[in-house]
Amino acid sequence: MANVKVYNIEGKEVGSLELNDAIFGVEVNEHLMHMAVVSQLANKRQGTQSAKTRAEVSGGGRKPWRQKGTGHARQGSTRSPQWKGGGVVFAPKPRDYSFKMNRKEKSLAIKSALTSRVEAQKLIVLDSMNMDEIKTKKFKAVLENLKVNKALVVLDKKDENVILSARNIPTVRTATSNAINVYDIVKYDTLVITKDAVAQIEEVYA
């Protein structure tokens, strides 16, 4: 089992924690991680884009001029794609971009992402993450104490003071342990996680 240091919000070492190898020490599967990221981004797409083909644009039923003798190129409709106001060739239509991964694949992708942070020494465990008031300045001080900039902060429970304090920092995202995903883990350089959140993740994914 990997043994990591535990810090307080002042950046001081206050203990250590053994991580479960079944979650934080698996063989990293980059293919599944990639699939999970693509799946998450695809599922976010609205898929509402739409344009009309020449068959759907109103008007243009009459031939604009006779076939021969005008000096113009022959035309059959003012709604052909080359005309202003005409239809679109291969017009985009609403579609569902989402695709699903099965539960086993999702689980292994999460484990791979967590393991990748441990292997890169980019996982910081906190004994707790509590704030008595909403103060972005204080939250920034915590990040400075931990020497991190771009981070995903994982909490064991929803804490409005922490969440609202971090909200205005563009390089930081907060999440609870039951809402982590591969995209956020790999997007942010460092994974900052509370000790209780580690226990919750190990309980869910073990």
Curated annotation (Swiss-Prot):
One of its GO terms (cellular component) is ribonucleoprotein complex. Keywords: Ribonucleoprotein, Ribosomal protein, RNA-binding, rRNA-binding. One of its GO terms (biological process) is translation. One of its GO terms (molecular function) is rRNA binding. It comes from the Bacteria. Residues 43-86 are annotated as: Disordered. The keyword Ribosomal protein applies. Belongs to the universal ribosomal protein uL4 family. This is Large ribosomal subunit protein uL4. It comes from Lachnoclostridium phytofermentans (strain ATCC 700394 / DSM 18823 / ISDg).
